[in-house]
């Protein structure tokens, strides 16, 4: 009887609270809607105040790229500069803006860096908006819940960008999808994005589900079933939110078949999504004479890629150490050259750790950090093997450059390299794939044991196959895909 009375009392309490809670919820929703409307009106007023009129009397469109690390030297930055160059050729009267966090360099230094590293010069001016809060998107800022922290940090950074310059067309060229709804619904912009790599993928969920330890799944989590289950729930919830913010984009461009499949799974916008292979400066490498590799005394193995954890440079060093132990290479002179860009102190520390690893293994490794394009080309022209070890690389511009330069590519057996790049050309071999220390060492050993004539045949096939990744192909496809933003 007492239990029934207690239950009745609880029901009366809940009934009494229902109306006040309902009123409070409605009031909160109205406040949020009002805040959104006021914020949007304020942003639109700022936009009208900064309007520039062209010679034809029409308002100039402002096209903005969100690329906080535009002064880095990776493939993503090459996409940025080639995309800008192609739009400037087509839409000459527009105003072009880059949101960047590279405060330690001047506009002139950034442009000179793009010319030196990528051999790209813009035909029209570009305005740089320097952002103060880039630290909020640094992985080191979030020891735990890194994906969520960086994504929310990008919203704050995006808000800073939006308040400093309100564009007509906004293009996220670096993978900060959480900024898309901000610029679309608050900024009133047409929004597009070029996706190099999904922030989260089905493969990442599989890694956690199977309790495998990788660079993005710490051993203490993979070894604990409870923590693995909690992380899996976190990843699934994040994937749902990521799918919604990505679907806000009016135009979606992805860089490979692998990325295309994952973005369709998550964003579910097939009618707005297209594959635009990234621009590779194939033409620049075509003057390298493939026959010069015939009778070389020292074989160099070259790797191109930013010094980020996912590039897995330790695998390259360990595989090279395993190669040197093979009897077939005892009489050969071999050296490993790691070429890449450092974005911050974290990357520089990583290079120091790699140097320490090579020293511990007692192997000769040369590190070339943030080198100019001319030096990069020289190393590629002298290399026998081009090495790549990133698991599920979205594409791999460095791989294409190696193939165009005449190196024999040895790439990771996954992602873009497997599906798009290191594939047979006219039924002929263009390179090799591997996925472990042993398989990399075995593949390098096999390549070095080939005759110069056999290596030349593979080089020629590879060079012919990469014509589809040229700057010209990228410009045509990028302009066609982004055209809806300008209509």
Curated annotation (Swiss-Prot):
Positions in the Lumenal compartment: 1-16
Intramembrane region spans per record: 232-252, 395-415
BP term (GO), one: dolichol-linked oligosaccharide biosynthetic process
Membrane topology value: Single-pass membrane protein
Transmembrane segments: 17-37
Major localization class: endoplasmic reticulum
Protein name: GDP-Man:Man(3)GlcNAc(2)-PP-Dol alpha-1,2-mannosyltransferase
């Amino acid at each position: 009887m007492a239990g029934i009375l207690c239950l009745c009392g609880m029901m009366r309490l809940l009934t009494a609270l229902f109306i006040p809670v309902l009123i409070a919820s409605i009031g909160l929703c109205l406040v949020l809607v009002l805040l959104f409307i006021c914020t949007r009106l304020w942003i639109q007023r700022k936009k009208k105040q900064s309007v520039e009129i062209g010679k034809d009397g029409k308002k100039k469109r402002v096209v903005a790229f969100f690329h906080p690390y535009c002064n880095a030297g990776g493939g993503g930055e090459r996409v940025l500069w080639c995309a800008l160059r192609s739009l400037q050729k087509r839409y000459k009267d527009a105003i072009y803006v880059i949101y960047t966090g590279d405060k330690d360099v001047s506009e002139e230094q950034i442009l000179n860096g793009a010319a030196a590293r990528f051999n790209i010069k813009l035909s029209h001016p570009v305005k740089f908006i320097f952002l103060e809060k880039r630290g909020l998107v640094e992985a080191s800022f979030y020891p735990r819940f890194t994906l969520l922290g960086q994504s929310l940090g990008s919203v704050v950074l995006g808000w800073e960008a939006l308040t400093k310059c309100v564009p007509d067309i906004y293009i996220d060229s670096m993978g900060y999808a959480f900024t898309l709804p901000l610029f679309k619904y608050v900024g009133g912009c047409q929004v597009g994005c070029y996706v190099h790599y999904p922030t989260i993928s089905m493969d990442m969920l599989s890694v956690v589900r199977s309790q495998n330890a990788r660079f993005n799944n710490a051993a203490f989590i993979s070894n604990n079933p409870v923590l693995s289950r909690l992380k899996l729930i976190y990843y699934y919830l994040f994937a749902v939110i990521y799918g919604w913010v990505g679907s806000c984009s009016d135009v979606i461009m992805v860089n490979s078949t692998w990325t295309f499949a994952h973005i369709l799974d998550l964003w579910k916008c097939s009618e707005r999504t297209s594959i635009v292979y990234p621009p590779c400066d194939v033409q620049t490498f075509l003057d390298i004479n493939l026959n010069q590799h015939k009778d070389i005394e020292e074989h160099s193995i070259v790797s191109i890629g930013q010094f980020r954890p996912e590039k897995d440079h330790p695998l390259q060093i360990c595989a090279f150490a395993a190669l040197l132990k093979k009897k077939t290479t005892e009489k050969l002179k071999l050296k490993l050259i790691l070429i890449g860009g450092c974005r911050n102190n974290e990357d520089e520390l990583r290079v120091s750790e790699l140097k320490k690893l090579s020293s511990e293994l007692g192997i000769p490794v040369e590190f070339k950090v943030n080198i100019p394009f001319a030096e990069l080309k020289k190393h590629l022209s002298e290399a026998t093997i081009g090495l790549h070890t990133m698991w599920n690389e979205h594409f791999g511009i460095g791989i294409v450059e190696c193939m165009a330069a005449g190196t024999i590519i040895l790439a990771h057996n996954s992602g873009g390299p497997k599906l798009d790049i290191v594939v047979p050309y006219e039924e002929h071999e263009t390179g090799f794939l591997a996925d472990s220390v042993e398989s990399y060492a075995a593949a390098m050993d096999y390549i070095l044991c080939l005759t110069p004539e056999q290596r030349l045949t593979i080089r020629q096939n590879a060079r012919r196959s990469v014509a589809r990744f040229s700057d010209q192909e990228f410009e045509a496809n990028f302009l066609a895909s982004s055209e809806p933003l300008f209509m």
